[in-house]
Amino acid sequence: GRGSNMRSLVEHQLPVRAVVSNRAEAAGLAFARDRGIPALALDHRAYSSRESFDQALTELIDRYHPEAVILAGFMRILSVGFVRHYEGRLINIHPSLLPAFAGLDTHARALKAGVKVHGATVHFVTPDLDAGPIIVQAAVPVRPDDSEATLAARVLAQEHRIFPLAVQWLLGGQLRIDKGVVHVAGNPPQWMFNAS
């Protein structure tokens, strides 16, 4: 992606040990390098299978001994082996109120469906696409005059609010999953609504 969610994590002073992308031209890599954060590209096209790429990706990530692996604009479906390796430490941000509009083109699909509320979700990653336990969500109204671009901009602003929060909870050991439901120590709100 554009790297804006990763930038949001850095700007919230969360510890980022490395930034990895499968695209050498990813904007987030340059941002990380400019701040002295190791920034690495691993081209998935150099590998014969998803599993072989994910194995190389795992080996690269593990060199940094991460407490968590945070997916921000990483647009590849990960293998079961990769997901299991980081189970409970692997989270993603998705531009919809899951379980609605999993996958791609969320804003266009939301507008076409005529939903009145749209938003973003931070969730644990499981082998099933965009189906992991939900950590936090933020909602925005869908306006009658919204385009994909205007809706996406409002959702992205909410992503920048909830993603650092979820990462902070994860790194602080505040998250617990019970029967597929995420609980946060201290019971802070796990949702936000911005009426504007």
Segments predicted by a language model, with ranges:
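Conserved beta-strand segments of alpha/beta enzyme cores
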Residues: 15-18, 38-40, 89
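Short beta->alpha connector loops at strand-helix junctions that form conserved
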Residues: 40-45, 93
